[in-house]
Amino acid sequence: MSSVYIVEEHYIPYSVAKKLLSDVIKSGSSSNLLQRTYDYLNSVEKCDAESAQKVVEELSSIISREDVRAVLASICPITPDEVRSILIMDSNRTYTSEDIQKIIDIIRKYIKS
């Protein structure tokens, strides 16, 4: 059995996690838990992995916290109140209405219709 070493750890959007799980399942390392997790992520996915990664990257100019960017790219809120409910996680910063609108505009570019 090979050893696994964690080199880095990052927060990732749901759709990126789904893609990684898909790769593991395709390699033959599937289990009931992995399949159920994949099915759940498939049911809540609002944009593909590539688009979610672009959302995270574009949000970095507005939001410094990686975890907040990952949650936004996972949930894809499209109203100011939804965005604010997530931004509350970042208690060290106050976001303006303009910031919130920029976040919504970025998300809308990539969300599935």
From Swiss-Prot:
It catalyses: RNA(n) + a ribonucleoside 5'-triphosphate = RNA(n+1) + diphosphate. DNA-dependent RNA polymerase (RNAP) catalyzes the transcription of DNA into RNA using the four ribonucleoside triphosphates as substrates. The highly mobile Rpo4/Rpo7 heterodimer stalk is conditionally required for transcription initiation. This is DNA-directed RNA polymerase subunit Rpo4. Belongs to the eukaryotic RPB4 RNA polymerase subunit family. It is an enzyme of class 2 (transferase). Its EC number is 2.7.7.6. Keywords: Cytoplasm, DNA-directed RNA polymerase, Nucleotidyltransferase, Transcription, Transferase. NCBIfam families: PRK14981.1-5 (NF011553). HAMAP family: RNApol_arch_Rpo4. The gene is rpo4. GO terms for biological process: DNA-templated transcription initiation. GO terms for molecular function: DNA-directed RNA polymerase activity; nucleotide binding. PANTHER family: DNA-DIRECTED RNA POLYMERASE SUBUNIT RPO4, RNA POLYMERASE RPB4. Coiled coil: none annotated.
